[in-house]
Amino acid sequence: MGEPYLLTPGPLTTAFSVKDAMLRDWGSWDGDFRGMTAELRRELLAIAGDESGQYDCVPMQGSGSFSVEAMLGSFIPRDGKVLVLMNGAYGQRIAQTLKYLGRAHVSIDKGDYMPPRGSEVAAALDADPAITHVVVVHCETSSGILNPLKEISEAVYSRGRKLLVDSMSAFGAVPAGVGDFRYEAIVSSANKCIEGVPGFGFVIARKSELEAAKDRSHSLSLDVHAQWAYMNKTGQWRFTPPTHVVAAFLEALRLHRKEGGVAGRGARYANNRDVMVAGMRQLGFETLLGDEWLSPIIVTFFSPAHPNFKFERFYELMKARGFIIYPGKLTVVDSFRIGCIGQMDSHVMQKVVAAAAESLAKMRVDTATPPALALAERARLAA
């Protein structure tokens, strides 16, 4: 059957041409590769819609979490205070990172089900004048919530604070440009909605923030200002770059443009979600979130209440049929996740539903209805 589809929020299934782009070796100091780095920076700024030239793009080696930590350590002063908006594992990771960095922080924790709202952010900022920055995850993939960044941003800037955004699993498919909502910096990575492969992340930040970040970072290798200054001076990365990943990313950017950019990519993902969710609901599965909060990136489903259902068995049966799904990350009830992103269309999602039906039959699970407790908990927290 060939390699399986990765129904995950990245790494994800990539196009053959993206894989093929990695078959050549590149010298990291060579002028051709320096040109490739410059091109990817320009292309990402174009996706961000920076027409005024107030922002710049700084690629950083490593996973997306490396770039999140780099952003936090570079742009939050050591005497600053952060409000972290949490509704899942990745918001919690931001708070954990700030603890390692020794940055004062407080949080609004909405649990697994609900997004932080602008009014809540406004109230928290009014109550604590010491807060200098707000940090939020754009798409919280532990649940699939797409957080309301526009109203959050308006609340932050109307009170004279600054916003930093982890758009790891949204940038490239969900509007996140400098004209969509205001922010000082936003981060994402190569292996998410642009559909490249893992190896680097990138920080898009105001040049004024980049300049102010000099000598602020806790880390040599995660210093965004130092990386930015060195790239602008030499065209090179400070340390060994993931050359093959950069080559693959440029091909992924070409395919992104060909599909219609953010709007085109987002439309395909949304259609993937709609087809898959409709089919899974016909089997009896229930989504964690109401339709108004379902992102086009990944969807969380409650595990069935049937005594024969075991996620590990379901996972292996789905894998045998060519689909890698994702375990849940909820704290209250059992769940699993199915991603909508990567080189897939609605026909693939129909096959996903068929594979789920076959897997349930193999397990002798005649209905995927979740436990009453899960539905009651969802209703209670969403009230």
UniProtKB/Swiss-Prot annotation:
Residues with PTM N6-(pyridoxal phosphate)lysine: K192
The record, for InterPro entries, names:
Aminotrans_V_dom (IPR000192), NH2EtPonate_pyrv_transaminase (IPR012703), PyrdxlP-dep_Trfase (IPR015424), PyrdxlP-dep_Trfase_major (IPR015421), PyrdxlP-dep_Trfase_small (IPR015422), SP_NH2Trfase/AEP_transaminase (IPR024169)
Q: How does it assemble?
A: Homodimer.
Task: Output the HAMAP family linked to this UniProt entry.
Answer: PhnW_aminotrans_5
Biological process terms from the Gene Ontology for this record are:
organic phosphonate catabolic process
Q: What does this protein do?
A: Involved in phosphonate degradation.
Protein name, UniProt field: 2-aminoethylphosphonate--pyruvate transaminase
Family statement: Belongs to the class-V pyridoxal-phosphate-dependent aminotransferase family. PhnW subfamily.
Q: Which Pfam families match?
A: Aminotran_5
- List, separated by semicolons, the cofactors it needs: pyridoxal 5'-phosphate
- Supply the enzyme class, top level: transferase
Record Gene3D superfamilies = Aspartate Aminotransferase, domain 1, Type I PLP-dependent aspartate aminotransferase-like (Major domain)
Q: Which gene encodes it?
A: phnW
Which GO terms fall under molecular function for this chain's record? 2-aminoethylphosphonate-pyruvate transaminase activity
Q: Which reaction does it catalyse?
A: (2-aminoethyl)phosphonate + pyruvate = phosphonoacetaldehyde + L-alanine
NCBIfam families this protein is in? PhnW-AepZ, PRK13479.1, transamin_PhnW
* Classification via SUPFAM superfamilies: PLP-dependent transferases
**UniProt-listed Enzyme Commission number(s):** 2.6.1.37
Give the record's keywords alphabetically: Aminotransferase, Plasmid, Pyridoxal phosphate, Pyruvate, Transferase
